[in-house]
C-alpha cells in the first residue's frame, strides 16, 4: 500500500512526523479516512482520536483537542491546539477530570455555561477512549 508523509503539530511541539499508510480522524462533517492519493482537503477536526497506521502496519492513537487537517499530494498535516500521544495519557487524571466535569454538570451552577461543561466532559471521554485504544494496541503487541 502506498504511503504519504504525516505531520501532527500541537501549539507546543511536533508530536508525530513520518511515512504512514492511513490516518483516521473526526472532521467537522464526520469521520475521515485518509489514504495516499486522497484529493486535497482542508477541514476542521473535532476533539477526539486520531488513529495512525504506519508504514510497517503498526498503529498509534493520539488525542487532539480539535484543530485543522490539511491534505496535499503526499502530505497530510494536522494542526491542533493540544495533541497528546495515547501512551502519554494518564488514566487516573482523566477519570478524575471526567468525574469533576460530570459533577459540575449535575450541580448546574448558574454562573457556568452548560455547553462549556458538556464540551469539557466530551474532551475527557475522548481522552479516555484514546487511552483505552492505546492500551488495547499495547496488549496486542505482547
Curated annotation (Swiss-Prot):
CDD domains: F1-ATPase_delta. It is found in: Cell inner membrane. InterPro entries: ATP_F1_dsu/esu_C_sf, ATP_synth_F1_dsu/esu, ATP_synth_F1_dsu/esu_N, ATPsynth_dsu/esu_N. It is a peripheral membrane protein. Keywords: ATP synthesis, Cell inner membrane, Cell membrane, CF(1), Hydrogen ion transport, Ion transport, Membrane, Transport. One of its GO terms (cellular component) is proton-transporting ATP synthase complex. Transmembrane segments: none annotated. GO terms for molecular function: ATP binding; proton-transporting ATP synthase activity, rotational mechanism. The keyword Nucleotide-binding does not apply. Its main location: membrane. PANTHER family: ATP SYNTHASE DELTA/EPSILON CHAIN, ATP SYNTHASE EPSILON CHAIN, CHLOROPLASTIC. Produces ATP from ADP in the presence of a proton gradient across the membrane. NCBIfam families: ATP_synt_epsi, PRK00571.1-4. F-type ATPases have 2 components, CF(1) - the catalytic core - and CF(0) - the membrane proton channel. CF(1) has five subunits: alpha(3), beta(3), gamma(1), delta(1), epsilon(1). CF(0) has three main subunits: a, b and c. Belongs to the ATPase epsilon chain family. This is ATP synthase epsilon chain. It comes from Actinobacillus succinogenes (strain ATCC 55618 / DSM 22257 / CCUG 43843 / 130Z).
